[in-house]
Amino acid sequence: MNAPVNKQMVVDAAAIQPLPNSRKIYVEGSRPDIQVPMREIRQADTPTQFGGEKNPPIFVYDTSGPYSDPAARIDIQSGLAPLRAAWIAQRGDCEQLPGLSSEYGRAREADPKLAELRFNLQRKPRRAKAGRNVTQMHYARRGIVTPEMEFVAIRENLNRRAYVESLQAAGNRRLLDLMTRQHQGQSFGAHLPEEITPEFVREEIAAGRAIIPANINHPESEPMIIGRNFLVKINGNIGNSAVTSSISEEVDKMTWGIRWGADTIMDLSTGKNIHETREWILRNSPVPIGTVPIYQALEKVNGKAEDLSWEIFRDTLIEQAEQGVDYFTIHAGVRLAYVPMTANRMTGIVSRGGSIMAKWCLAHHRENFLYTHFEDICEIMKAYDVAFSLGDGLRPGSAWDANDEAQLSELKTLGELTEIAWKHDVQVMIEGPGHVPMQLIKENMDKELEWCREAPFYTLGPLTTDIAPGYDHITSAIGAAQIGWYGTAMLCYVTQKEHLGLPNKHDVKEGIITYKLAAHAADLAKGHPGAQIRDNALSKARFEFRWEDQFNLGLDPDKARDFHDETLPKDSAKVAHFCSMCGPHFCSMKITQDVREYAASQGVGEQDALRLGMREKAIEFVKGGGKLYDKV
């Protein structure tokens, strides 16, 4: 854990390979330096016996940054290129500092024993000029459409217009109707325009219904948006602990997580060298990075919650903001008066941050200093454009505790704090539970929308049952899909190691894929424009026995291919009209194809073909003597 960073450290080769039959494309915005990444999945033509038509490429959201671009030069030691640096500088409202202003940051920088662990960043941190505000919300409320806003507008549309135009150009009206058909959704009041414009993005951010987490000290990040009127996003958690993991392992987890679709990453490190670990992650991350600053503050006082102070916490906020953290989980809603409400719970306070602040409140019998200093925190946030993720420190840790007085009291307070943050033009999202049975989930969403004025909701699951240790990625994905449908903007993944141990790379991938599935199911249920195109493409490939396209259009092509090849490994099986589930004689899709071919040969429709076929078999039965069984 304390070993020096390997100066030859490189990203895992598996994380930088393009996904099968995919390539990175960039859609240019109104200026040459707005290059929005997407993944293009190429498809095979439909076989001649099924119509012999061209299947144009499908475009999907891509969070992998330059790692999956063969043209990019990946060097973990140097970090990623500062994509947004020019945009930030051109606004003229921030300044480069002579050095770090955090006392702790300066101490780490000056410690020669840390030289082998340190990322050698050459540039100095930036901060807003005196009296200025550098948040995306501040710009939005002044009618300014930033490059970041245009970037996310293009990104959210997923090149859908180009896809539809390619279908129209082919002159195949049937294919156009087939691929763009989508069931009507139930959006529960969300506003889902057919096409996202930069102006729509600006309006949503100005109203507080969406955020773009984009610290001015994290110029490597590719802008993304979190809000219920946009695609549902997912977060992946990584981080070391006091007993396991290293810097290189955490960077590996980050690059692995974004390959499979993590829209943001939270570094929840609680072990040694938190500062250095975070620096390596930030400099190599194309997605926003979130943290829980109270974890590091606690390490600074040797794990004694009662020794925490506003001064230590403030220095930690500045330290992390100057490194480039894009959003902070702040447990300012854990008020002294709410702590006794948890006494009769089944599982008490399960949030680490919540329990830390509850212990501090009780030790001093004083109000939570995060609450009393909230406006001071806002001053720091707006100087760097760090977004609030207002923590649910009193979230239920069991179904028994769901939607209780403590949880809902804190949620009301988070709504009050949201309004204070908005007075400073600081971006806010609200964290949510937790462990909640399905019938109580909608109440959480409804109250959040009402009490928190439609600020984006960011939920951990929720886990819908407590009976499945080792399978909590599934128990939580059930609740995640449901609450995403109701309006949650971002889902925090849960891995199968939840409640059991620190996740490894395999667990990270399983958690990400599971939550991508939940988020997509929510987009479909809401009726998000274009959400069904990928489903339609995969279903068409499945019906036409285009096995490679089935694999490649899925969320995890590798697993799909491996499962297929366990029983049918030969290349010839990739063009077979069956799989090992039903075999060649009982494949429902093959039977349907046979019916269609018979109908075409008879010049009739499918229903008529079935009737004709039955009549022919009846005549054959009578001619054969009408015997129920033949002797063998």
Curated annotation (Swiss-Prot):
Pathway: Cofactor biosynthesis; thiamine diphosphate biosynthesis. Keywords: 4Fe-4S, Iron, Iron-sulfur, Lyase, Metal-binding, S-adenosyl-L-methionine, Thiamine biosynthesis, Zinc. GO terms for cellular component: cytosol. Its cofactor is [4Fe-4S] cluster. One of its GO terms (molecular function) is 4 iron, 4 sulfur cluster binding. InterPro entries: ThiC, ThiC-associated_dom, ThiC/Bza_core_dom, ThiC/BzaA/B. It comes from the Bacteria. GO terms for biological process: thiamine biosynthetic process; thiamine diphosphate biosynthetic process. Belongs to the ThiC family. This is Phosphomethylpyrimidine synthase. It comes from Chromobacterium violaceum (strain ATCC 12472 / DSM 30191 / JCM 1249 / CCUG 213 / NBRC 12614 / NCIMB 9131 / NCTC 9757 / MK). The gene is thiC.
